[in-house]
Amino acid sequence: MERIKELRNLMSQSRTREILTKTTVDHMAIIKKYTSGRQEKNPALRMKWMMAMKYPITADKRITEMIPERNEQGQTLWSKMNDAGSDRVMVSPLAVTWWNRNGPMTNTVHYPKIYKTYFERVERLKHGTFGPVHFRNQVKIRRRVDINPGHADLSAKEAQDVIMEVVFPNEVGARILTSESQLTITKEKKEELQDCKISPLMVAYMLERELVRKTRFLPVAGGTSSVYIEVLHLTQGTCWEQMYTPGGEVRNDDVDQSLIIAARNIVRRAAVSADPLASLLEMCHSTQIGGIRMVDILRQNPTEEQAVDICKAAMGLRISSSFSFGGFTFKRTSGSSVKREEEVLTGNLQTLKIRVHEGYEEFTMVGRRATAILRKATRRLIQLIVSGRDEQSIAEAIIVAMVFSQEDCMIKAVRGDLNFVNRANQRLNPMHQLLRHFQKDAKVLFQNWGVEPIDNVMGMIGILPDMTPSIEMSMRGVRVSKMGVDEYSSMERVVVSIDRFLRVRDQRGNVLLSPEEVSETQGTEKLTITYSSSMMWEINGPESVLVNTYQWIIRNWETVKIQWSQNPTMLYNKMEFEPFQSLVPKAIRGQYSGFVRTLFQQMRDVLGTFDTAQIIKLLPFAAAPPKQSRMQFSSFTVNVRGSGMRILVRGNSPVFNYNKATKRLTVLGKDAGTLTEDPDEGTAGVESAVLRGFLILGKEDRRYGPALSINELSNLAKGEKANVLIGQGDVVLVMKRKRDSSILTDSQTATKRIRMAIN
């Protein structure tokens, strides 16, 4: 009541009324701004004002039992007054100091695990080396970069499920952990974080950093892998750069790098096979990178590179809508065109059929070492503004743009015939023919292009046909700029289609990518790439083909053996024997094949001539299309170790050495595996194994289906008949006995019956 009286008294004085109405505080908007909502509007001011009070902090009541009322200096740490509107107590900032000095120690074992990404960053910086600072103009271009080293590659949704499962396992809500990486991470984290006292929210934040790739669109000159981006602020400014070598690598950068190498190898190999698309898919599905299936990585990893995008397109995944030509990524920024076939004549009077883009268009071109802006009309380059690291890189960009412009003077600059072929020996399309031609030598192209006087524009200079800079003249329409062109920032992905020859098109039918665009650069992968597909055996050279082929036969011997006797043609056509053919001299391949096939036929016809080691050894030679000839061979030549080495038709050699006693095969001194099967040289063991409990009825009878191996016989029902392959490579018809009592006599009658059945 007293208060209200006092206020009424104040209000009756005219001066009070004037102050309250004339000053701006009565603006409802301002009052609202500072009083509505929970969000603090001026945190700095609030903090200063709060800290000026004696007890600015509130704490749980239990704190009064854990902290003394006064510290050693006799200062009060908490007030006996309750916080208005809650049952908490008011505490002095000095209480925090006391707690930090004298409070209970907590277990720190979980800190390095939770804050793993920070601890690892400190280690990388500790071991990194900073070099000299150079002052020079920095050509920075904005690229989408990974800013978070050391992460797994889960999608936001996958990570959310993992985090919920680890941090809040008892919360309700459907969580489906499907991918291998999700399950592994969840198990690992649950074990690591047992009895963890750090707040669940903090744990969730830190897990997110570890599981999800975070990207930003940042200006970069130099390394773009995440271990360089984390120190971007230390290594490059507007006019300076500091050399830096990271003090450690992170798995996500290694995955990106190894994925690009694997994809390039696979696309290059698929392009030369009979059915490129089927081969590519087979290889992607059977390849592992650092122990993880390549297809899983492709689904999660956002790396954009030509070969990687071709693999993604083959798997039906969306990719970026930009297209690739001459190793540059083109993105149309304005204009449009229609395509029309046109025949043009080169300087050598060769006719080329090109698809002409009619209409005005503008593009950005982004390469590894140069970038450009291109404006063009129908078969005419209007303007090209290039920036690049060095003369060579700038020249590359100019050549690509000139070819892409389809100008007549470019086509007339061709000297000699265009007959470039791809790895599969097929002619390249005309645009790539032109590109390859001028990439080899662009002198005539630049000379014929023409020059023009130029205006003095800030940040731009001219470039002459011999690639020297100039401020007076420049090649027509071409300028060099100090500023780079930013990479296309959008993360948009489009649905694409891919044809059998690995050409990727958007839904309008424009070709975005083709195998010609895949870089030939060879690198060494950081993570182990395991190609299980036979198509990739040759990647490590001829020796690897030899060893892998024989390993494959030994691993699959049971089925190979049956096919050898039943359906040899199908066996000879197996794709696993394809790589081997490149080791056999072309001129004699057919004769070797004819010879081996005849030899094998004799083995099938004549009892007791079946020889496991010899079949394994000669089988790959039978895969080539056979030529009939009377030639007899005692040895075959294979091209390995840079020269011809010999495989003996009968007997061992350094190339192929089979030890009958241990059943171990060594190829070129490398272990190629051990044969696990019944000894088929002596017949006794085989017969008892085959025939115990079976009655031999006579010769093979095709009505009872293909021959079974010994191991498959056990599945027969009593009284059931089947053909079976016995040790010598012969096939006989047997019946499973109806009674078990007569098993003993089987082995004795077996030998007689087999001889009768076969003869």
UniProtKB/Swiss-Prot annotation:
One of its GO terms (biological process) is symbiont-mediated suppression of host cytoplasmic pattern recognition receptor signaling pathway via inhibition of MAVS activity. The keyword Magnesium does not apply. Pfam families: Flu_PB2_1st (PF20947), Flu_PB2_2nd (PF20948), Flu_PB2_3rd (PF20949), Flu_PB2_4th (PF20950), Flu_PB2_5th (PF00604), Flu_PB2_6th (PF20951), Flu_PB2_7th (PF20952). Its main location: virion. It is found in: Virion; Host nucleus; Host mitochondrion. InterPro entries: Flu_PB2_2nd, Flu_PB2_6th, Flu_PB2_C, Flu_PB2_CAP-bd, Flu_PB2_middle, Flu_PB2_N, INV_PB2, PB2_helical. One of its GO terms (cellular component) is virion component. GO terms for molecular function: RNA binding; RNA-directed RNA polymerase activity. Signal peptide: none annotated. A motif (Nuclear localization signal) lies at residues 736-739. The record marks 627 as: Mammalian adaptation. Keywords: Cap snatching, Eukaryotic host gene expression shutoff by virus, Eukaryotic host transcription shutoff by virus, Host gene expression shutoff by virus, Host mitochondrion, Host nucleus, Host-virus interaction, Inhibition of host innate immune response by virus, Inhibition of host MAVS by virus, Inhibition of host RLR pathway by virus, Inhibition of host RNA polymerase II by virus, mRNA capping, mRNA processing, Viral immunoevasion, Viral transcription, Virion. It comes from the Viruses. Gene3D superfamilies: Polymerase Basic Protein 2, C-terminal domain (3.30.30.90). Influenza RNA polymerase is composed of three subunits: PB1, PB2 and PA. Interacts (via N-terminus) with PB1 (via C-terminus). Interacts with nucleoprotein NP (via N-terminus). Interacts (via N-terminus) with host MAVS (via N-terminus); this interaction inhibits host innate immune response. Plays an essential role in transcription initiation and cap-stealing mechanism, in which cellular capped pre-mRNAs are used to generate primers for viral transcription. Recognizes and binds the 7-methylguanosine-containing cap of the target pre-RNA which is subsequently cleaved after 10-13 nucleotides by the viral protein PA. Plays a role in the initiation of the viral genome replication and modulates the activity of the ribonucleoprotein (RNP) complex. Belongs to the influenza viruses PB2 family. This is Polymerase basic protein 2. The lineage of its organism: Viruses, Riboviria, Orthornavirae, Negarnaviricota, Polyploviricotina. The gene is PB2.
